[in-house]
């Protein structure tokens, strides 16, 4: 009995990544053995994602307010370089997608458009939506997971409490610590949640439906892999002047894997916060940069918008010159930063990019439908890239600031 409890204790306290790997293998095995049984355990995945999504808004709000309220005077938060990295990384992703799409042009088999979807009419509408999310009712922002509004109100409350008594600030610090403990508990349940998610995904879709779009997926995933394994490490190396791969691989392993299966940047915020804490990053920095990254750091979305738009142009025989491709990179990068402000995310911003080439809205919506077909893989890979990059760039900016402080 003692040996059994000792084994269970070791299992519970062991490597989370190994446990997640076991969950993935078990999920695939169950789905291969019995589709019905796999569908029965789908609720485990839904519960896990639901728990992360439920705690993420209050975690961000309290952590941001507490960090700013308890911030010492003249403390550097390094937010400017992080925002610059986010924007540059998103543009680099769009540019990489353009180059890869031109090297490997793809034809789409267009299907019927998605019913009941309403894409934005222009970049102005996307920015307008984002601005109004900024001044959303704070209670509504917490209820709906509007992280732009949550950040704005969290920063506002933190600044207002900056001159409050020490006991008031301590209450916020204690509540913040308590919520972080709850997050740690939820993250320990990741292997069970991912087991349910993998089993359900394989049972419901398999990969037969996506086989017809193999070349399109190869271009999409190839662009994302280049960003994750070549471009991002290069950017990090320029910032920290040392081998970037230990940091990049750790972030992909501990943040990217979870994000891949939850397919939600919002649900992955608590995971990223916990990883930043493990990396011993500045709490005043990551408490703001991680939720901000979940909103504007959208390299994966920029790739999706660019690749599908250029595939549509190639299918219709539209010639794309270098200047137009460059303009598409800029539009895709700006649109991607606003993806969180659009219901349906990156896919519903495709008609906006298609309008650059005079592609009609009807055809553009058929391209969106193709996006939904490959969404099982596209959305998962996009989220993994977006979410892991948030931690990578935050860590790079923090380390660069520390190195600068040591030198001078």
UniProtKB/Swiss-Prot annotation:
Keywords: Amino-acid transport, Cell inner membrane, Cell membrane, Membrane, Symport, Transmembrane, Transmembrane helix, Transport
SUPFAM superfamilies for the chain: Proton glutamate symport protein
GO cellular component term of the entry, any: plasma membrane
Gene3D superfamilies linked: Sodium:dicarboxylate symporter
UniProt catalytic activity: L-serine(in) + Na(+)(in) = L-serine(out) + Na(+)(out); L-threonine(in) + Na(+)(in) = L-threonine(out) + Na(+)(out)
Signal peptide positions (record): none
Cited function: Involved in the import of serine and threonine into the cell, with the concomitant import of sodium (symport system).
Name of the molecule in the record: Serine/threonine transporter SstT
Provenance organism: Shewanella sp. (strain MR-4)
Taxonomic placement: Bacteria, Pseudomonadati, Pseudomonadota, Gammaproteobacteria, Alteromonadales
């Amino acid at each position: 009995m003692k040996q059994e409890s000792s084994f269970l204790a070791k299992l519970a306290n062991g490597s989370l990544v190994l446990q997640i790997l076991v969950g993935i293998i078990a999920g695939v095995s169950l789905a291969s053995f019995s589709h019905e049984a796999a569908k029965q355990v789908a609720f485990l995945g839904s519960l896990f994602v639901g728990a992360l999504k439920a705690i993420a808004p209050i975690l961000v709000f309290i952590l941001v307010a507490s960090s700013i309220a308890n911030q010492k005077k003249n403390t550097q938060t390094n937010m400017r370089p992080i925002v610059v990295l986010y924007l540059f990384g998103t543009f680099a992703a769009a540019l990489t997608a353009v180059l890869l799409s031109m090297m490997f042009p793809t034809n789409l088999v267009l299907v019927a458009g998605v019913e009941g979807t309403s894409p934005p009419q222009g970049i102005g509408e996307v920015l307008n939506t984002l601005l109004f999310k900024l001044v959303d009712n704070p209670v509504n922002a917490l209820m709906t997971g509007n992280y732009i509004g949550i950040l704005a109100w969290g920063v506002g409350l933190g600044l207002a409490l900056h001159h409050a008594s020490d006991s008031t600030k301590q209450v916020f610090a204690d509540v913040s610590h308590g919520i972080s403990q709850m997050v740690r508990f939820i993250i320990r349940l990741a292997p069970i949640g991912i087991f349910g998610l993998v089993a359900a995904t394989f049972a419901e879709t398999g990969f037969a439906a996506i086989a017809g779009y193999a070349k399109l997926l190869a271009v999409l995933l190839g662009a994302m892999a280049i960003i994750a394994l070549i471009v991002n490490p290069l950017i990090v190396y320029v910032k920290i002047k040392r081998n970037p791969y230990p940091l990049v691989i750790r972030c992909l392993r501990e943040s990217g894997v979870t994000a891949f299966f939850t397919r939600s940047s919002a649900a992955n915020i608590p995971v990223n916060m916990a990883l930043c804490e493990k990396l011993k990053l500045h709490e005043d920095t990551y408490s703001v940069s991680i939720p901000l990254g979940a909103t504007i750091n959208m390299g994966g979305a920029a790739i999706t918008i660019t690749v599908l738009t250029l595939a549509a142009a190639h299918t219709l025989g539209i010639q794309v010159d270098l200047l137009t491709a460059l303009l598409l990179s800029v539009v895709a990068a700006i649109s991607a930063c606003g993806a969180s402000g659009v219901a349906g995310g990156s896919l519903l911003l495709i008609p906006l990019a298609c309008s650059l080439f005079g592609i009609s809205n009807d055809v553009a919506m058929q391209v969106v439908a193709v996006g939904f077909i490959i969404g099982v893989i596209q959305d998962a890979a996009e989220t993994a890239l977006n979410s892991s990059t948030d931690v990578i760039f935050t860590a790079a900016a923090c380390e660069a600031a520390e190195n600068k402080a040591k030198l001078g």
